[in-house]
Amino acid sequence: MYGSSNYKQEISLGIDCGSKMIRLSATTKAQELYSAEVELRNDIVNLLSTRKQYRKTRRSRLRYRKARFQNRVKSKNKGWLAPSIENKINTHIKIIVDLHKILPITNIIVETASFDIQKINNPDIEGKEYQEGNQLGFWNVREYVLFRDGHKCCVKGCKEKVLNVHHIESRKTGGNTPNNLITICEKHHKQYHEGKLKLNLKRGESFRDATFMGIMRWTFYNRLKQIYPNVKNTYGYITKNTRIVNELPKEHRVDARCISGNPSAKPLGYWYYIKQVRRHNRQIHKAKILKGGKKKLNQAPYLVKGFRLFDKVEYNGQIGFIFGRRTKGDFDIRTLDRKSISKSANYKKLKLINTRKSLLIERR
């Protein structure tokens, strides 16, 4: 009535960045206005590795193909990042852009982290020891792994002398790092791959998430700064101190509220769980060729009885998402944490709430 139409409260957005999850909290000094957790896609590495495997096999069947060298994208494009990392950075930015459409955010505070992986492995490391890794003095990884395991098979009581180095997690996604390799004799190695022997093996600690945070940290911050100039950076120790001073519990969404700079703001009382899914399965046929040289389709119909995969629906008063479809019209309905609502819900009993998006949203 008295010139208040142009007045806007200052809203701060706190973002706790992550490799698997993003936590967000938008607050004023008095009230929390938005709280969410976003689950990022972690299937991209496996999908790209599988695609690479099929591509190499396909090319190997073409004998006259010219050798391909010096064709690496990384060497051509400065600032190139792996698709899995690029996707996660873009999702961080997309979430923030979408939130600006519903709230007049004035400040953005981002918490990122850098990890000293060498220090995690060895807290006492210093100086030139950073350049003297575990494999110093060994010809290759295989020689180091054999030495580390005492040139003995991992199967208890085995005294076979012909030894192999086995990947605990598939090399396709696990790589050739020593903590993913173990010594096993040729006899037991063959039995294991034939399914005749079971081994309870767990790979050593993986630093994928720590590596990702180190790569994405400044790239994300600088890209976001180009879109919104009012971006500030903060650190984990500051968030921890804020949480302790205000006697708040250790929860990720609480951390996001502390990052926003308003730890004493009244909690919203509910929050949103957001899950990112891929939009399309671009593999046309299954890799396995059936009898008669036939190829089986790897893609389901776009619509089944008017519904798509991951459509948000209501069934018997419960809200869920379509996780599976059958052509006769019976669907698998679940919540985003995969809790089953119905394994065979008839399409006639479903009420469409929202068509599928790349970001599925569930209020909790």
Describe every region a protein language model picked out.
Residues 339-364:
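Intrinsically disordered, low-complexity, charged/polar segments
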Residues 311-312, 318-334:
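Short beta-strand-centered aromatic/proline hotspots
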Residues 6, 19-21, 27-136, 200-306, ...:
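Substrate-contacting helices/loops that form the catalytic groove of nucleic-acid
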Residues 10-18:
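Two-metal-ion RNase H-like nuclease active-site motif
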